[in-house]
Amino acid sequence: MILIKNGTIIDPSCKREEKGDLLIADGKIARIAPCGEIQEEGGEVIDATGMVVAPGLVDVHVHFRDPGFTYKEDIDTGAQAALQGGFTSVVLMANTKPVVDNEETLNYVLEKGKNTPIHVYSCASVSKGLQGKELVDMELLYSKGAAGFTDDGIPLLDVDILEQAFVKAASIGVPVSLHEENPALISNNGVNSDIAQKKFGIGGSPREAEIDLIARDLDIALKTGVILDVQHISTKEGVELVRQARQKSTRIHAEATPHHFSLTQEAV
């Protein structure tokens, strides 16, 4: 038996958030009660004061950089870091070297993930080599375990390719995740075209670059019925566009990075 005491117990599935004790017996949650109500009976006791007790967290957008860029991270170290942060399931992006656009590379990632203490899933790329010119074999890669499709970090500019990807993904019921920045509107990526641009005297990326592609792709997503994930959204206008689209379809989703929802350009 394991008794976890004095933690903040959070379970989004039932909207629970309260301080209390949690008893685990035979690998299952046996009881949740206010602090001090569960008596210690000889098992392991963990004092979780100041900590959160929650189901395993899921991160649908991670970079373990394996294969090809393991000087930054690899599947083993990434999984260990995820576990330390409470994440028990992760979805890897496909922008590795080689790109996860074929069965062999996808199998390498998934097999290596099986030897970690967490659940490791992986996306495949939407286009071959992340070039945005030719679709991967989505049906094959999905059948071999791809959790979704993304050219993360590179926007899909060819509308014909995008529509083909959406139609195919919708037919097999798998999500497509998109990096939304129109490069035609950007003079220097990674810096907002406002305070930071003026402060450092460099070009920047205007909010319109994100808004433009989000609006385009939401329209196509609603027409095709695809499950769409708008990646690392960073503007209030983008959020509002997603909110409006979700009123028409629950297949529309968005994600944000910690720095996008916790910092503004004034922090530069």
Where are these regions (language model features)?
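Histidine/acidic residue-rich metal-binding segments in metalloenzymes
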Residues: 134-268
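Divalent metal-coordination and catalytic microenvironments
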Residues: 7, 22, 27, 50, ...
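Acidic (Asp/Glu)-rich catalytic clusters
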Residues: 109-115, 138-143
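Metal-associated gating/positioning segment near the N- to mid-region
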Residues: 51-113
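Active-site metal-binding motif and surrounding structural segment of the metallo-beta-lactamase
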Residues: 37-53
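N-terminal metal-binding scaffold of metallo-dependent hydrolase/deaminase domains
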Residues: 1-40
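Short, acidic/polar
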Residues: 71-79, 130-140, 216
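A glycine-rich helix N-cap at a beta->alpha junction
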Residues: 111-126
